[in-house]
Amino acid sequence: MARVSRQTPQQYSGRQAHPVDEVLPVAKLTLYGFQHVLAFYAGAVIVPIIVGNALGLSHEELVYLINADLLTCGVASIIQALGVWKIGARLPLVQGVTFTAVSPMIAIGLGAGGGTAGLLVVYGAVITAGIATFLFAPFFGKLVKYFPPVVIGTVLTIIGLTLIPQGLQDAAGGAKLIGHPGYGDPKNLAYALGTLLFILVVVRLGKPYLSSLAVLLGLVAGTAVAWLLGDADFGAVKDADWFGVSTPFHYGMPKFELFPIIAMVVVMLITMVETTGDVYAIGEVTRKKVDNATVANALRADGAATILGGVFNSFPYAAFAQNIGLVRMSKVMSRFVVVAAGGFMIVLGLLPKAGSVVAAIPHPVLGGAAIAMFGMVAAVGIQILGKVDLREERNALILAVSLAAALLPNAVAPFFERMPEDIRAVLNSGITLGSLTAVLLNLFFNVFTRRSTMEIDWDDIEGDEPEEAHGPLGAHEPAGAHRPAGPFPPQGAHAPQSPHAPQSPHAPQGPYTPQGPSTQQGHYDPQGTGNPQGPHGQQGPHWGAPGN
C-alpha cells in the first residue's frame, strides 16, 4: 500500500489557489470527471440491483431504482465537492450508496412484505437516519474513540460475511429461481465463475487504471458472453424511455417504523466512521488542511444525501474510497472534477434506457462480481483483526459473540420467528445485530472499565511501498467493497505515538485516537499509508466498486 508523503501541507498565497480549488479547463474537467464515473459506476449500480432483486421488483421498477440512485449520487457528489453553507467538505469526494446498508435494507423490506411496499418502510428509515446524521454531525468526533480496531474489524468482517450469500444467490440464478429447476444450473455457475476469473485476471495483469475498472469490465464481459450465447435478454431495453425524471415519493409516502429506523441509524453510525476516515485521507492526498469543521460538513453532506435518497427513491450515501485513490493516482486534485463527475451521473440518471441495459445484467454475472466485492470487505475486516491482540480474552469475546450474533439470521432463518414482528427488522439483519453486539460489548469490556484495545499501524499491515507502484487504491486492495473506516488523525497527524514513545513534531497526537491505557502498544494510522480505509468495506485495490 502506497504511503502518502508526510509533509506539512503546502501554504498558498492569497493569489495562488490551492489545487483542490483550481478550476480546470472544460476539456480537462470533462475527461477527468468521466474517469471518476468509470471508476465509480459498478459500485454505484450494484446496490440497487441487489436490493431490488432481493425484494422481488420488476425490471421496470429496477430501472427506476438505478436511475434514482445515479441521479442522487450526482447531486450528492456536487454538494460534497462544492459545499452549500455548512454542508459539504469542499473536497474531491464522490458520494455513493454504502454497502453497509444492503443487508439491513433487505431485511427491512422483506419484513414489510417485499416489493414496493417493503421499499416504503425502507425509505422511511433512510430519511429518518439521514436527519439523525445531519443533526449529529458536529458531535460525532467525540464518539469515534468508541470504534476501535476490534469493533471496526469485526463489523467489516460481518458486513462481508452477511453479504456474500446475496452474491452466491445471484450466482445460482437469483432469488426468483429458488425452488425452480434453473436454480443452481451449471450454466449459471459457469457465468458467475467466468466473471469472477475475468476480474481476477484484470487485477493481476492490468495496469493500475485498468485494474480500477476490473469489476465494471467483468460485468461487461460476462454480460457480453451471456448475450452471445442467448442467455441475456435485452428485450425490455427497446421499450424503455430515452428520458425520464425521478420524482419524490414515486412509490407513495414512506412509512416510519421504530425498529427499521433503529437499524438504519446503526448503519449510518458505521458510515459516519467511514466518512471521517475518508475526509482525513483525501486531505492527506491533496495536502489540504482538514479540521473538525471539515469533518462535520462532510457528515452533514452524508446526512443530506441520505435524506435526498429516501425522498427520491434511493438509499444511504457515503464517500467512495476508490475515487480517493484515483485522485492520488492522477494527481488531479480539483474538486470541480468531482462536480463534473456529478454532472455525468445526473445525466445517466435521466436516461431510463441506459438503466434498462444495466438492469438486464444476468443474475449469475452479477453474482460473480458481487462475490469478489463482498469477499474483499470481509478480507479487510480480517486484516484489521490480525493487528488486534486476540490473545486478550476480552477482544476475542467481542469478535466471537458478535460473529455468532451476525450469522444467526442467515444460518438459522426461523430463529427469530416468534419475536414481535416490528423488532424483526433489527434481529433479521446480521449487519445490524452483529454491529450492535460489537459496539455494546466493547463498551462493556473496554470503555466502562477504562480499557482500550490496541491501535493499528497500517504500514505494518500493508508494507511500505513506493507511491508510484500503485494506482487507485494500492495494488493489494481490490475495490468493490466499502472500505474499513476508522478514526483518522487530522492532517499532519500521521502517526499517533505510543504513550511510551518519544514525542516528535512529525507525529503529533490526533484527536481521534482511542483514549486510555492500551493492552498492547500499536498505532491506528490508516491514512499514514495513503489508502483510505472505511466500513463501507475497502473500495478495493484497483477495482471500481462499494462502501463504505
Give the role of each language-model region.
Residues A2-P92, T100-A112:
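N-terminal signal-anchor module of multipass membrane proteins
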Residues R6-G14, A44-P48, G52, G194-L205, ...:
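Juxtamembrane interface elements at the cytosolic ends of transmembrane helices
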Residues G14-R15, P19-V23, L31, F198-V201, ...:
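Hydrophobic transmembrane alpha-helices of multi-pass solute/ion transporters
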Residues V26, G52-R90, A263-R335:
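Membrane-embedded helical hairpins/re-entrant loop segments and their flanking transmembrane helices
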Residues A27-F40, A44, G184-L196, L213-A214, ...:
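Hydrophobic, membrane-embedded alpha-helices of multi-pass small-molecule transporters
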Residues Y64, I87-A101, K145-I152, L210-L217, ...:
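Short, non-helical or kinked segments that cap or interrupt transmembrane helices
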Residues I108-A232, G342-M454:
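Membrane-embedded alpha-helical modules
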Residues G430-H494, P514, P532-N548:
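Terminal cytosolic tails of multi-pass membrane transporters
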